[in-house]
């Protein structure tokens, strides 16, 4: 007989706050690995930023770098993040790491489940206050990233875009690549920042930008359902 999971999960006993020295804060802990968008950390809701991106965009590496601790599991195999991971920073806000989207080798059932989790999280009554959309700086704009950016805009979620793996972009190509990304994603309400988990380029700036936009921002209410999004209908 399997134990029925509570829709509101408590912090695991093994999840202890880790002292860090990062642009986002001084302590961080994994508060909840959730397998459905309905699972939330126990207690009063805190402001939250959701981290989104294609599989293998470097989400886990970036989270570890910007939080200055190895809290997220890093794998060379795309699609290893298979739950919503809630990280509590300074007891002030949550960072939510989502499964990556767009990895063709992931089983369709899993892709649909991940897409459903993300859509429910973004459009639910207690949606995130901010989104960090990661795009691969080496590849330029991808259709799946365009779709997610549109989904976030339609849902009314303020967004910061970070171009990852910037250290792997040749110096001679950086200006052209950044212009292409900016033309697609950047506007006065949606800043774009090239970053590198390897060299630390622009990570302090990214951390301060996210924190400034989270702290003091009023909690969002229900986000309107988006007409289109990352979820695919099951056959």
What is the predicted role of each segment?
Residues 97, 164, 196:
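Active-site glycine-centered loops adjacent to acidic/histidine catalytic or metal-binding residues
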Residues 101-111, 138, 167-170:
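Flexible beta-alpha connector loops of hexameric P-loop NTPases
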Residues 87, 164, 206:
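Residue-level signal for inorganic ion chemistry
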Residues 81, 111-115, 142, 200-203:
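Amphipathic alpha-helical transducer elements in NTP-driven molecular machines
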Residues 25-38, 168-223:
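Canonical P-loop GTPase G-domain recognition
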Residues 116-190:
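Conserved C-terminal guanine-recognition region of P-loop GTPase G domains, centered on the G4
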Residues 68-69, 80, 111-114, 148-152, ...:
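Glycine-rich, phosphate-binding/catalytic loops in enzymes
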Residues 2-105, 215, 220-234:
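Conserved G1/Walker A P-loop phosphate-binding module
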